[in-house]
Amino acid sequence: MVRLCTTNFLAYRATGSPLLLLYFYLCSLSSVKSSAAASYTNASDYVLRNVFEHSDQCYKDSFVYVRADDKKSDPFITYSTTKECSERLKKNDLPEKLPTCPPGLIDLELKPVYVPKSQISYPYANLNISVTAHSSVDTIAFRLECLSASDGSDVYCSNSKAMYINGVKEWPCRGIHLSSRVQYPTRFSYSCFRLTSFSVYAINATILPQKCRVSTIMTAPYFDDMFPEILVDPTTNQSIITKTDPFWAPMLSADFSDKNAIWVRLGKAERAECETMVVNVYKEHDDDSQKVTFLEILTVKCPETAVKWENQKAGRYLLTAYVPIRGCKFYCEKKERGCRQCLRTHLNLVIYKNRASLSWLALQKFKDYGFEIFIAVVVLLILIIVLAVTGFGYVLWRDKVRSREVRNIALTEFVKVMIVYADDNDLHTDCVKKLVENLRNCASCDPVFDLEKLITAEQIVPSRWLVDQISSLKKFIIVVSDCAEKILDTEASETHQLVQARPFADLFGPAMEMIIRDATHNFPEARKKYAVVRFNYSPHVPPNLAILNLPTFILPEQFAQLTAFLHNVEHTERANVTQNISEAQIHEWNLCASRMMSFFVRNPNWLETRWKPKDELAALHLKRQSPVIVPIQTEEDRIAASIKYNLVPPQALVDSDDEDDVDLQPHASHQNQPLILLPPEQCGPDSDSDSESDSSSESESESDNEGEDPKTIVVKKS
C-alpha cells in the first residue's frame, strides 16, 4: 500500500474545514495500516511505501521501504532457494569464520510459529527467522544448520539427497539483495523452516558488504509442551486461558552477537502468559563425566524475552529454561507429595573463548591459580625482605667504614656570626666571652659581640646597630639562659622586665622578635642560619623557640659541631667531629660554667634581683631638696664651683687668653648672685619625660641620695 496523499484535493478546500480534517485522518489511518510494524517507519520529510511482494507466504513479515515517488522497479532481489542464496555468498569468497557484526547494524530474532492441522498433516511448528537492518547493507542472508537431533525425524539433520547441491551438502539458506534506493530500517523474514523438538540448530546471518556475521544456537522443547492445545485452539477465549493458566515450556536460544556476553532469548506461543521465565546455568566438567555444577540463575520478567548472561569462561554449559506456573518447581523430590515439576527446555552449549570483562577474568585467574599466586607472593615478599635486610646492612657497614675515615677540613674562610644573649649577670657574660674568644681563636669566626661594639663606640645607636647586623649577617648564635627564658615568655614579659645593668638597654628581646619573624617565613633556610646553644647550667630551650626546630648545641662539649654548622660542613649526627681546641681552653670554659653554677647555689633567688615588675622600674621621681646656697664673689669662685659640682667651666676660663674682654662682661653681672644647685636625675626608663614635672614633689633630706654618682646637674636662678 502506498502511503502518499496527493494535494489536488487540498487545493480546493479551505484550511480548517471538516472535510479537510476527515481527509487527513483517512490518510494517517491508511499510513498506519500499510506496515506490519509501524515502529519501523522512517520519520522523514517524504512518504515511504512498502514495495516487498512475494508469492510465498513464508516472507509475509518482511518489508522494504522506498520513497513513494520512486518509479524504478526491482529495488530488491530475493534468493528463495538454497542454491541461489549459496551462489550469491560464494561470489564474495567469504572465509569460514567472519567477525561479529557491530552493535546496531542488524537484529536477529527467532520465534516459534504454530502450524495447525490440515488435510495432509498433523499440527507442527515452524521457525521464524527475521533479520532487521538498521543501516545501509547490500545483502542479507541466513542459514539454518542442524547441530544435533534426538532422532531421525529432523529432515535437516538427515542425509537426504535434497540437502545436496552438485554433490555438496548445503544447509538451507535464504537471502535478499537490496538496492541503494532502499530506506532503512528493512526487515527480511522467513517463517517456513520446520522446527523439530529437541533438535539443536545454529542460525548464521551474514551481511554484505560488511562481511560480518551474527550467530545464534537454539532448541525447542516437546511440541505439546511449547504449544498446549488450549493455547493454540482458536475457539478458546483469552479469559479462559488466563483462568486455566496451562503449563508450557519456552523455546531457548543463545545469541553470540555480543563479544563480552551472551544474550539468552526465550520464545513462546503467541497467547502464552507468564510473570517470569527462569534459566538455570550449569557448568559441565571437562572430564566428559555426566556431572554438572550449578553456576547461577537468570530471570526474565515477562513480557521481556531476553536476558544478558555476562562473564563466562570457555567451556561446556547446560542451560535449562522453565516457567514457574501455579507453583510448579524445577525439581521435585521422590518422597515429596503434591509437587508439580515445571516443563523444561534444555540446551547444551559450547563456548570456545572467554566472554567476560577484564576485571572478572583477572578475578577468575586468581581463583583458579590462588595457591600458585600465594606461593609466588610469599616468595616475592621473602625476596623483598632479604633485599631490604641486605641493603640496610650495607648502609650500616658503609656508615661504619666512613666513620673510621678521617676528613681534614681546613676552615679557610672567616664567618661573621652574631652572638644573641641576655644580660643575666657578669658570670654568665664571662661564659659568653669565652664563647666569643674560642670562636675567634679556634673556629675561624668573626664574632659580633655587643660588649665590644657598643661600649667602645659611643656614636653607635644600639637599636640601629642591631637592625643592621640582623639584616646583613648570615649566621647567628642564640644563647639560652634563665633571663632569656623569661624574656621569651610572652606572659611574663607583659608585667616584668630585665633590670638594666649596662649603659644601653638589653637587646635580646628585640633581636629575638626579628629572628623569630624571619625564621617563621622560611623554616629550611632558618635551620641553616640560626643555631641555639646551651651551657651546662642553662635551662632547656623554651617551647616557643624549640618549635622552630633549630640546631641546638651544648657547650663546650659540642663546640666542634657548632663550628661545623657555622662553616656549613655537612656531617651526620653520628659523625665524630673534632677540632683543634686545647684542653686548657676547655678547662677554663668549664671553670666559668662552674662559677655560674656555684653562684646559683649561693644565691637561689638571684633571678628576682634581675627580673622585676615594670612598675618598680618606673622612673624614680626627683624630689625637691633644700637649696644649697654657694656664694660666688669672684671668677675664681665660679670656676671652683664648676669643678666641684661637675659644671661646664665658664667660657672665660676656656678662652681667657683670646677673649678676656668679651667673655668676662656677662659673668660680672652675676658675681653677687647666689646659685641654687639641685641633685642629679637618676637614670630610668622615663626619666627624660617626667623629671621636670616631678621636681615639684615634697623635699627630702640630702641623706637619701648620698652615694649616688651625679650624671646631670641642672643650674637654675633663685
Swiss-Prot record:
Residues 414-564 form the SEFIR domain. GO terms for cellular component: plasma membrane; plasma membrane protein complex; receptor complex. One of its GO terms (biological process) is sensory processing. Residues 687-707 have a biased composition (Acidic residues). Glycans are attached at N42, N128, N204, N237. Forms a receptor complex together with receptor ilcr-1, which upon activation acts as a modulator of neuronal activity. Binding of the ligand ilc-17.1 to the ilcr-1/2 receptor complex triggers a signaling cascade that activates the downstream signaling components actl-1, pik-1 and nfki-1, and results in increased neuronal activity in RMG interneurons in response to input from oxygen-sensing neurons. This leads to increased animal movement and promotes aggregation behavior. Component of a heterodimeric receptor complex composed of ilcr-1 and ilcr-2. The receptor complex interacts with actl-1 and ilc-17.1 with the interaction being mediated by ilcr-2. This is Interleukin cytokine receptor-related protein 2. The gene is ilcr-2.
